[in-house]
Regions:
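An alpha-helical, amphipathic repeat domain used for nucleic-acid recognition
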Residues: 1-168
Length: 168
């Protein structure tokens, strides 16, 4: 009886810790599972392996059910932040989402929320930043834009736009 009470208290404390962690920013299920394993390993009295697996599933179910963990919401947030603040292109953002454990379909859906012209505007803005370097190091600027995650078509469009502006 006392052991059951201790386990229940530890389980509740672990879940509360995870809820607080998830409240900081949007998290994916894979990130939550990784953190759960970390929380379980750092407990002063870790549960038995079979109990730990049960707790992990209970916690994931609870976090998802209460809205702390949502892959789609996390993907949309990640897409918005990395486009607006880091000026990443769609390819790099998709790779980042896949690394966080977001499924391809959810990642594609979050990328579709951004209109194509907004991606192109970001590529144009980044190309404009490097306009002074363009004549001497065109290949370097192209590689830089590609590494930022923009598809070749957007890179060429951005560079063509700069060249047509300079011709005018």
């Amino acid at each position: 009886m006392e052991q059951d009470l201790k386990e229940k208290k530890a389980q509740t404390a672990g879940l509360a810790r995870l809820q607080k962690w998830c409240g900081v920013r949007d998290r994916t299920e894979q990130e939550a599972r990784t953190k759960i394993k970390e929380v379980l390993s750092k407990m002063s009295e870790p549960p038995a392996p079979s109990t730990a697996l049960d707790w992990e599933e209970d916690w994931v179910e609870s976090l998802c059910g209460e809205g702390y963990v949502d892959d789609a919401r996390c993907a949309e947030s990640y897409t918005r932040v990395h486009l607006d603040h880091k000026r990443w292109g769609p390819l790099k953002i998709k790779a980042g989402l896949r690394a966080r454990g977001v499924s391809s379909s959810v990642a594609e859906a979050s990328l579709r929320t951004v209109p194509t012209h907004q991606w192109q505007d970001a590529a144009d803005e980044l190309a404009l930043r490097r306009v002074a370097e363009l004549e001497a190091n065109r290949d370097r600027v192209i590689r830089w834009l590609l590494q930022r995650g923009f598809p070749q078509s957007m890179v060429w469009t951005a560079l063509d736009g700069l060249e047509s502006d300079s011709d005018s």
